[in-house]
């Protein structure tokens, strides 16, 4: 049982790491975060229905981009293994098929969980910003992607860290910091949390 768990965690961790290094993940996550965060500004003049429109649009975008990202990551994870020939070598060793495919699924699910954390945080903040004005939260929310990219670029230049995975993780961390700041100051639309968790 212990060996099975070690193999499972090793394959799932490598799958998550490979998925985090895909440029499409960073591109889709950043564009989703920016689009959701700009929705309160773009949909400002809707005669009192701005909050509902922002909430529905943000949840729909969260679902659609998560679906596209999950499909791409799952097909890319298995496609790479088949093209490289590592699938046959892994399955010829004492790794069962069910363990391999469940670990691949868990790795893709881990990457999607990070994506959902980022877009869920932005959805909660955008739902509140559509109703109430919070300039400090808005500024922090709009600068989080740029700060993540800038710091990831510096880490890539000086420490040779991979840009895509570092920028993605920093984006999630910076959005979490903005969320904590907004929660402390009372600028979070908590009623969107169950819907965001269902997605």
Language-model regions: role of each:
Residues 1-26:
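Aromatic- and glycine-rich beta-strand/loop motifs that create alpha-glucan
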């Amino acid at each position: 049982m212990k060996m099975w768990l070690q193999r499972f965690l090793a394959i799932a961790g490598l799958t998550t790491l490979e998925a985090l290094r895909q440029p499409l993940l960073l591109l889709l996550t950043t564009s989703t975060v920016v689009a959701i965060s700009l929705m309160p500004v773009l949909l400002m003049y809707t005669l009192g229905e701005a909050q509902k429109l922002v909430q529905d649009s943000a949840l729909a975008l969260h679902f659609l981009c998560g679906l596209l990202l999950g499909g791409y990551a799952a097909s890319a994870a298995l496609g790479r293994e088949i093209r490289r020939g590592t699938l046959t070598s892994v399955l010829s060793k004492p790794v069962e098929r069910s363990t391999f495919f469940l670990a691949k699924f868990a790795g893709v699910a881990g990457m999607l969980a990070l994506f959902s954390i980022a877009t869920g945080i932005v959805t909660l903040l955008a739902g509140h910003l559509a109703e109430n004005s919070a300039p400090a939260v808005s500024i922090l929310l709009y600068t989080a992607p740029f700060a993540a990219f800038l710091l990831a670029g510096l880490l890539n230049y000086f420490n040779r860290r991979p840009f895509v995975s570092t920028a993605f993780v920093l984006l999630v961390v910076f959005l979490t910091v903005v969320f904590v700041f907004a929660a402390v100051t009372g600028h979070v639309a908590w009623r969107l949390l169950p819907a965001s968790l269902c997605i």
